[in-house]
C-alpha cells in the first residue's frame, strides 16, 4: 500500500511541473530540393519559361519529322540541357539555390545548308544575354541511338550542340535535292543548266539557290518576322512557305466571292475599292527619270549579279 502511494505521489509531482520544453527532444532535419525556382509546377504559367515567339514550321528531310515532339537531355557540370528538335533548346541549373537559373537557349528557326546538304539546325531568339539573344546551332551526326552528345559555348551567348541519331547515318540522308517538290527540283535543274551555259555567275547561282531554299521553307527570308507567342492565342496563319501563301490567298479570294454573292442576293449595294499600283502612285508624284532612279535603288542586285 505504501509503495502504491509513493508511486502516485511521484506521478502527481511530475504532472505539476508542466510539459517538457519543446527543445528537449532532438530535431530531425530533412533536406529536399527547393521548388522556389522557375520550374516550380505550382507557380502560375506566367512565371515559367516564356518563349519570345513560336517555332518555325517543321521542315527538312521527312525521316527526321519523327523527332518532332520529342526531347533529349544531357547533364554537364551543374547544368541540364534539353534539346527538342523543331522546337527549342533549354538550360536548367541543377542546384538547391532558390533562384536556380532556367532559360531558353534558342527557338527553332531554320536549317544551315552547306554544299546543298543539311548541316545543322539553328535555334535563335533565346533569352536575353546582355544586348542580344541567346542562340544555338545543333549539328546532326551519325550515332547508334538518338541522344544529345555534347554541349559547349564557343562564344558568349552562342551554344554548339551535337545530336547523334541513326537517322542520318546513310550518306544521302541529309541531301537537300531529294526532299524538294517536283516543281522545285525542275527549278534547280534549270539553275544548274544556266550555270553550265554561263548564263549566270557563281554568285548568281548561289543567290538563286537561296531563294529556292526559302520557297521550300528550309531558310527564312532575311528580315522575315516570326509569329510571337501569345498566351492562349493561335499559332499564326502558317504562311511559312510560298505554297502556303498561295493556298491562303485562294481561300481568302473564295471568301470574298462568297460575301459578294451574299450581298447581291439581299440587294445590298456595295462598291469595290479602286486599286492604285505602286508605279501609278509614283507616276503621279515623280517624273519618269525619278521613277527609273527609284527602281534602281530598290533593285536587290540579283539580275545584275547573275547576267
From Swiss-Prot:
<keyword id="KW-0964">Secreted</keyword>
<keyword id="KW-0333">Golgi apparatus</keyword>
<feature type="disulfide bond">
    <location>
        <begin position="71"/>
        <end position="84"/>
    </location>
</feature>
<protein>
    <recommendedName>
        <fullName>N-acetylglucosamine-1-phosphotransferase subunit gamma</fullName>
    </recommendedName>
</protein>
<keyword id="KW-0732">Signal</keyword>
<feature type="disulfide bond">
    <location>
        <begin position="129"/>
        <end position="157"/>
    </location>
</feature>
<dbReference type="InterPro" id="IPR044865">
    <property type="entry name" value="MRH_dom"/>
</dbReference>
<feature type="glycosylation site" description="N-linked (GlcNAc...) asparagine">
    <location>
        <position position="115"/>
    </location>
</feature>
<feature type="domain" description="DMAP1-binding">
    <location>
        <begin position="176"/>
        <end position="279"/>
    </location>
</feature>
<dbReference type="Pfam" id="PF07915">
    <property type="entry name" value="PRKCSH"/>
</dbReference>
<feature type="disulfide bond">
    <location>
        <begin position="142"/>
        <end position="169"/>
    </location>
</feature>
<feature type="signal peptide">
    <location>
        <begin position="1"/>
        <end position="24"/>
    </location>
</feature>
<dbReference type="GO" id="GO:0046835">
    <property type="term" value="P:carbohydrate phosphorylation"/>
</dbReference>
<feature type="glycosylation site" description="N-linked (GlcNAc...) asparagine">
    <location>
        <position position="88"/>
    </location>
</feature>
<keyword id="KW-1015">Disulfide bond</keyword>
<comment type="function">
    <text>Non-catalytic subunit of the N-acetylglucosamine-1-phosphotransferase complex, an enzyme that catalyzes the formation of mannose 6-phosphate (M6P) markers on high mannose type oligosaccharides in the Golgi apparatus. Binds and presents the high mannose glycans of the acceptor to the catalytic alpha and beta subunits (GNPTAB). Enhances the rate of N-acetylglucosamine-1-phosphate transfer to the oligosaccharides of acid hydrolase acceptors.</text>
</comment>
<feature type="domain" description="MRH">
    <location>
        <begin position="69"/>
        <end position="171"/>
    </location>
</feature>
<dbReference type="InterPro" id="IPR039794">
    <property type="entry name" value="Gtb1-like"/>
</dbReference>
<dbReference type="GO" id="GO:0042803">
    <property type="term" value="F:protein homodimerization activity"/>
</dbReference>
<dbReference type="InterPro" id="IPR012913">
    <property type="entry name" value="OS9-like_dom"/>
</dbReference>
<comment type="subunit">
    <text>Homodimer; disulfide-linked. Hexamer of two alpha (GNPTAB), two beta (GNPTAB) and two gamma (GNPTG) subunits; disulfide-linked. The alpha and/or the beta subunits of the enzyme constitute the catalytic subunits.</text>
</comment>
<dbReference type="GO" id="GO:0005794">
    <property type="term" value="C:Golgi apparatus"/>
</dbReference>
<dbReference type="InterPro" id="IPR009011">
    <property type="entry name" value="Man6P_isomerase_rcpt-bd_dom_sf"/>
</dbReference>
<dbReference type="InterPro" id="IPR010506">
    <property type="entry name" value="DMAP1-bd"/>
</dbReference>
<keyword id="KW-0325">Glycoprotein</keyword>
<dbReference type="GO" id="GO:0005576">
    <property type="term" value="C:extracellular region"/>
</dbReference>
